[in-house]
C-alpha cells in the first residue's frame, strides 16, 4: 500500500483543488485499518481505502469501478475501492499524480517514453477525464455538506496556457534550401498550388529581410496575440550551438536577440527546451540551462522552467537510466511542462492543475511543479491523424473539462505549425482553443 507520506501528499493536493483559498493545515488525515478519517475542527468524515490486493488489482487495470456524475453533470466518472464501498479517492489519485505506474514500468517507445498504451488512463478509459480534479470536487461537495458554515467554496479561476516549443527557428537557411523546400517538398509532394504560392510569398519576404522568415514571425505573432488576450504564453528554446547533436539553430543567431526583445516587451515567459540527448546525459541539461541564462542576461531573466524535446521524461527506476526528476533538480528547474502523451491528447497525470511531483523512490514530495500538457499540435494531426473538424472538437472538449474543474488548459503549438498544410489547423483548432 501507499505510505503515510504519500497519503498526506495526495490529500493535500486534493484539498488545494477542492478549497483553493483554504488553509490546508487546518485538516488532519488519520489512516485507519480500513479507511481514512479526515479531521477538521470538531468535525470529521471517513472514507474507505483499498487493501493491498485491491491496490495491485487497480494497478493492473483489473478493478471494476462504479460510476457517478461528473462535476458538470455532463457524463460519469469511475470510483474505485472496496466492493462494498468503492469510494477511495486518495489511493488512485496518488497513482495518477505520482505517475506510480511509470516508476515500475520498463516498457517504452522508440524514444524511451512511457507509452499511453501501458497507462492506467488507457486501461480505465480516463484519458479525457481529469479524474483527480473530479475527485477533488467530490471532496469539496462532501466537506461543504458536512460543515456548510465552515466551508464556502471560492472557485479558482481557470487558465488557458499557450506554450510553444521552438524546435525550428527558421524555415529558410539559404536560397538553395529555400527553393528545394518550395519546389521539392511543396510542389512535388503536397502538389497544392495554394501552398506553393504561399511559400513563394514567404520566400520573397525572407529574401528582403531574413527576420521575416515565417517561423520567426510566428513566434512574434504568438507573443503579440496572446499577450493582447491577457494570456501568459511560455516559449521553450533550445540552447545549442551549430554542430552539436539535435541542433536545428544556433542560440547565438543574432535574430534571437530581436525575438527575445519582443518576448520581453510582450511579457512572454522563456523556458528551456531540453535537447533530445539531455534526457540521457548527466549534466547536459544544466549546461544548456546555464547557456540560455547567459544569452538572456541582458533581460534579467533566470530560466527555471523547461520542457524536454520529444516529451522525453523518464521516471522508470533503474540504475542504467537517468531519472528526469534528478536532471531537472540538478539543472535548477522548478517548473516542468513535459508530462503529456505524444500519441494521445488528454490527462496523463489525471489533473490539469499545477502540482508538485512526487519522488516514489525516496517517498517524498519534490519542489518541482508539473504543469500537465493537455493538447499538442503534432498529436492531433501526426499521431491521431484527425481532421481539422475532429481536432477542433477534441480540443474544445478537453478545454471545457479543464474549465469545469477550475484547472489550466496547457496547449502546445509549434511555431512551424502555422503555415502551409498546418494553416487550417492553426486557424481552425489553435486560435479557437486560446480564445478566452
Where are these regions (language model features)?
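Terminal accessory/targeting
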Residues: 1-250, 341-344, 353, 360-436
